[in-house]
Amino acid sequence: MTKLFEPAACQVDLRTGAMSAATGAYQKRFRDLAGLYADEAAFSAMRENWNDTVVYEVSEFRPNERSGDLIFGTTRMLPGKVGDEYFVTRGHIHRQSDRPEIYYGQKGSGLMLLESPEGEVRIVAIDARTVCYVPPYWIHRSVNIGGEELVMLFCYPADSGQDYDCIAKAGGMRVRIVDDGEGGWKQVDNSSWRKRDAATIAALYGLEKKEKSA
């Protein structure tokens, strides 16, 4: 007989970004984000006051990690910059890369920075009451470009998984989001970014797995 999971309801506190009835949570402190930003000197200088500060935290409801279910939760992210570069999350592609994701902006002003395995770039605004669709195969990271906390709800298939190393191996994402000096933002090239070779691109699309199973 099929075992049914119990339905659930979770409340989101927009002040803290926390979600009730969460089954798990994690935090990323400023010190955990070393290597993400272009201005290493600015990052080092900020560590004296920011080192233990929680830059972003995630609360999630994870019933299981099997195909056919969903994982959902909230991300709360502080406003701020390292040099002129806005605060970002580490970012990832799904380990099962053909899995999509939905983000719903609940508070603040942010961007979803997306990159294809080949290096195409897309940027989607996430403001309050905005739904952002992240299609399969896109690497993605969140950016807080506002002056207040960014709170987002996310939802993705339970068997998606996360691959964080794909960004680090390429020297970061292809572009960075920086202050344009006029109260807004602009994208600039990441001089450390390295184009992925054909084998790496195929792996990110899951083509190797498909060939082996054929």
From Swiss-Prot:
Domain of life: Bacteria
GO BP terms in the entry: gluconeogenesis; glycolytic process
EC number(s) per entry: 5.3.1.9
UniProt-annotated binding residues for Fe cation: 92, 94, 101, 140
GO cellular component: cytoplasm
Database matches in InterPro entries: G6P_isomerase_archaea/bacteria, G6P_isomerase_prok, RmlC-like_jellyroll, RmlC_Cupin_sf
Keyword Ribonucleoprotein: no
UniProt keyword list: Cytoplasm, Gluconeogenesis, Glycolysis, Iron, Isomerase, Metal-binding
Subunit structure: Homodimer.
UniProt-recorded name of the protein: Glucose-6-phosphate isomerase
Gene: pgiA
